[in-house]
Amino acid sequence: LVGEEKLEEKYTKKVKNFQWNYFGMFAVNVALDEDVGYRADNPSVNESYNVVLGREDFEDIKREYRQMEDGMPVSPPCYTVLHPTRLDASQAPPGKHVIAIWQYAPHDLQGGAEKWDEIKEEYADECVGMLSGFAPNVKPSTILGRFVMSPRDISRTNICMIKGDTMGGRLTQDQMGILRPFPGERAYRTPIEGLYLCGPSTHPRGGCHAANGYNCVNAMAEDLGIPKWWAK
């Protein structure tokens, strides 16, 4: 965006040393004829926005990360299901629902990242199939459509998410809080006057929706001497 020649060497070195996650996001967005009906002892599960499936204990989590480190899709899957229409019915026609399955997955598969283009629909079948085991009403007759995005797809469509990394970089001690994205730099500001950062690589991280942008706007207001009317 700027050009390395316009930045000091100490800054470009920090950029090059920034660490990205080795895994990204695999997403299956599904349109349904009815809401998901989970088989659960606790009825509040069918009112929840987020439901986590497949991570029954610490061994499942370790298996998940081992498989990703080996360049393999997680199988059996361990993922989060989001239910947006439970909170905002306007996201679907009356009586219909949408869900999103979010599964961590490696960008660089065994055989190369391009392999995602070959297997993503098959892996989406596995993810949806597992959901059907927990919610029998999720079946071909109730699925109106779906849209699948592999880590490779995400990296193609969002330049902030290198290798599909929705967190905007590793959440290690040296890349968190005031150290994000780089130690010793003024938060949300760059060496280029008037150029600010507000993507997932800034504090707090990706997934904290609007927080990065809100913090960035506050920094801009401070620099420009603009009253923060939104903070009143």
What kind of region is each of these model predictions?
Residues 31-33, 93-127:
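Conserved FAD/dinucleotide-binding core of flavoprotein oxidoreductases
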Residues 30, 101, 127, 131, ...:
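Hydrophobic, well-ordered secondary-structure elements that form the walls
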Residues 200-221:
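A conserved FAD-binding loop/helix module that cradles the flavin
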Residues 222-232:
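Active-site-proximal substrate-binding core of FAD-dependent oxidoreductases
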Residues 89-96, 185-190:
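Short glycine/proline-enriched loop/turn "hinge" motifs that connect secondary-structure elements
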